Swiss-Prot record:
Cell compartments where the protein resides: Cell membrane
Stretches that traverse the bilayer: 15-35, 87-107, 109-129, 144-161, 164-184, 193-213, 224-244, 281-301, 316-336, 360-380, 395-415
Keywords: Cell membrane, Glycosyltransferase, Lipid biosynthesis, Lipid metabolism, Membrane, Phospholipid biosynthesis, Phospholipid metabolism, Transferase, Transmembrane, Transmembrane helix, Virulence
Pathway where it operates: Phospholipid metabolism; phosphatidylinositol metabolism
The name this protein goes by in its record: Polyprenol-phosphate-mannose-dependent alpha-(1-2)-phosphatidylinositol mannoside mannosyltransferase
Keyword Nucleotidyltransferase belongs to the record: no
EC number: 2.4.1.-
Length: 440
């Protein structure tokens, strides 16, 4: 019933499919409500939300966020630094006026909604289930129901999504800003504004500038960079001392974010650190590996963007964005497993293409990705004793990285190498006319 291709459902659908759809909606609603109760019914302590609130409170009180080794004493008993740019502390300030349970509930509920929104946007760009006679609901609503049905179990069973909620992280918020800006065919705002804001809130989304560069969309790339700069300057205007400290000192100190050897640090840097290599050879190997993965990503994304059939034109931008997202995760100095919330949209993409193309490769990627996130092998690495683990445990414990490599390679191999007949970004313009800042 839930057709995952662009073919129209048979006309004259009987009563049974309609009833099945209503049952599906009821089950999905029940699943989302159950997940909501799990997350909000008895609000657990979420340590990162605690730090966010204290960062916002420090800014409101005029206390330093970073200077003199500023540390925040969490209710969980750990002393942690504030690792985001000053603009993020300003954004978190309203939550400082709320109690910790209320702030936790607000951020958690927002995260759940945005996860459904992000998944809906991906399904829409992939043109999933565009026509049907089963229901009169518009396509976007059908896709939202499908997205909710995917998100509900993901929150409980997929390790990156589950841990994101357990810590109270904002990775889903950042991911949604990126997806909403990059994936739709058109946006009601000049494309690049949301990505620029995401970069100003946390530096890691800057990797998606590569996406617009690969699309040769220089106008949007420059608009994104300008937005990030303007937003960061707003941080200087509102928190001058903290901004100077962050951009001149703190931003270079990645050690304050956490120990690279921890098993949940799923990236190249973590894999090398766990081998026990010295700092100099490890840095050289990391740089070489990053350039190699960059070359692989550029190759795969460009092949995806050169597709010239109707299906590939629909899929190409999403495939390219997936490559860039995975590249950013594996080359970042720190990529905790809860940063890998991109696993959900990537799995949605591989599952849709596995069905649509009857692809063994995408089917294998989907199955492997689900297995790795549901039965995570990260725990094969003994926590805080990762460098003593055997080689096979180290390889298995870094499985997110190897899966990401496999996804990028498969996208490059299966994508058409034929040249697109039109401009790379002509179908992805925002609705805003040129006079108001048309995105190129």
């Amino acid at each position: 019933m839930l057709e995952m291709s662009k073919r129209q459902s048979p006309r004259g659908a009987g009563l049974a499919p309609t009833i099945a759809w209503r049952v599906f909606q009821l089950l999905t609603l029940a699943g989302v409500l159950w997940v909501g109760w799990r997350l909000l019914g008895r609000v657990p302590y979420r340590i990162d939300i605690d730090v966010y609130r204290m960062g916002g409170r420090a800014w409101l009180d005029g206390r330093p966020l970073y200077a003199d080794g500023a540390i925040f004493h969490t209710q969980g008993g750990l002393d942690l630094p504030f690792t985001y740019p000053p603009l993020a502390a300003i954004a978190f300030a309203p939550f400082a006026w709320l109690s910790l349970p209320l702030a936790s509930s607000a951020i958690t509920a927002t995260t759940l909604v945005l996860l459904i929104v992000a998944t809906t946007i991906v399904l829409t760009r992939l043109d999933v289930w565009p026509h049907t006679t089963v229901t009169s609901e518009p396509a976007w609503m059908r896709r939202a129901w499908l997205a909710a049905a995917m998100v509900a179990p993901a929150v409980i069973y997929l390790e990156p999504i589950r841990s994101n909620f357990e810590f109270g992280q904002i990775n889903v918020v950042l991911m949604t800003l990126v997806i909403a800006d990059c994936v739709p065919r058109r946006t009601p705002w000049p494309r690049g504004l949301l990505l620029g804001l995401a970069i100003a809130l946390k530096l890691t989304p800057a990797v998606f500038l590569l996406y617009f560069l690969l699309r040769r969309d220089i106008h949007t790339l420059l608009r994104t960079a300008a937005t990030a700069v303007v937003a960061s300057l707003a941080g200087f205007a509102l928190a001058w001392s903290d901004s100077v400290e962050y951009w001149t000192e703190t931003v270079r100190n990645t050690d304050r974010i956490g120990t690279a050897t921890l098993n949940t640090n799923q990236n190249i840097a973590g894999a090398l650190a766990r081998l026990g290599l010295g700092e100099s050879p490890r840095f050289i190997l990391w740089v070489l590996a990053c350039f190699a993965v960059l070359a692989l990503t550029v190759w795969a994304a460009r092949r995806a963007l050169r597709g010239d059939t109707a299906d590939q034109t629909t899929e190409a931008p999403v495939l390219a964005l997936v490559c860039v997202a995975l590249f950013g995760l594996v080359v970042s100095p720190v990529s905790w497993s809860h940063h890998w919330v991109w696993m959900l949209p990537v799995l949605v993409v591989t599952a849709v293409l596995a069905y649509r193309r009857r692809s063994v490769w995408f089917t294998a990627l989907t199955a492997a990705g689900l297995a790795l996130t549901v039965w995570t092998p990260i725990t094969l690495l003994p926590e805080h004793r990762e460098t003593t683990a055997s080689l096979w445990r180290q390889l298995a414990g870094g499985s997110y990285v190897w899966w990401a490599f496999a996804v990028i390679v498969v996208i490059g191999l299966v994508s058409s190498s034929r040249t697109h007949t039109g401009d790379a970004h002509e179908t992805d313009e925002p609705l805003v006319p040129l006079a108001r800042g048309e995105a190129g």
